[in-house]
Amino acid sequence: WIESIQLTKGTGSVVNGFESIAGQINVELKKPESAEKLLGNIYVNDQGKTDLNLNVATKLNEKWATALLLHDNFMNNALDMNMDGFKDMPTGNTFSLVNRYKYDNSNGVLAQFGVKVLNDQKVGGETSFNENSDKYTQNRYGLAINTQRYELFGKLGYVFPQQKFKSIGLQFNASDYQQASYFGLTNYNANQQSFFTNLIYQSIINSTIHKFRTGFSFQYDKYNEDYNLNSYVRKEIVPGTFFEYTYTPNDQWSLVAGIRGDNNNIYGSFITPRLNIRYEPVIGTVFRLSAGKGQRTANIFAENNSLFVSQRSLMIMGQNNSGAYSLNPEISWNKGISLDQKFNVFNNPATLSLDY
């Protein structure tokens, strides 16, 4: 499925939002116009784990292309190699699907949209655990996490034919996430409905040395969580605007400075500034400097499911049933510097990276 992975250290670009704190990971899936027409593989090991993959891609005509990516894996054997009475790994099944369509009229109009589906079911605990008779009892310990996620995404862009440096684009993403789980006597169920859209305009100031991107974004999240007998419901609505300036006088220097302003219906208005500088004095030696701010709302239960296994009770002190668990958002100021040096070792390329 994966064509490439890009890793960005530091706070990243304001165009992508305000939440990035330590870095960003962008995973590029195989594209409809360049993926294999047909690719399938099957993996089975002696422990019973089975993986099935099928990729199908085709060009429908000169303007349209589509790709279908399918994956299914299952593990039904309750392994207990160390004979402690507990499964060494969960049993269950995972199915995922991605279907993408891409449009290019060769005259500046580009479009892409698709769907993603995930259905994941996992059961762990004692090897003798039976969901039908032992669930929510002290007979035998067991846990299960059942997850369903559905996503619709798309991009629409226009590049001005006579001014290739100028473009306008719209991104959107809508998803529904549901989790039903239990960990021994602990119960946790969650539902998240999200919508995100980003309108981006890109152009130059006098010359391509001075580029800028600006636009508007809108984020909507609705959370409904049940932890044992407690319910946590919240809705976050965050409209925002941003401006980013890029200065590239030559191949050695580049500077990206950005600022965005957002308004969260729970936490109010806030500003997010960011700066990234790159300097390459000689080919193969690159210095990078970054600084900026990030802010996010922590989903304390969903991000710490592993704590439920211990059967400890999680208590939020001073609850007033408002906002996100009555807690403040996470806010971080991040700054760093790095050096990347490329060289050869026995005629093979290598890279040394130093970060602070």
Q: Where are the regions that the model predicts?
A:
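Flexible loop and strand-edge segments within Gram-negative outer membrane beta-barrel domains
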Residues: 75-96, 102-168, 174-192
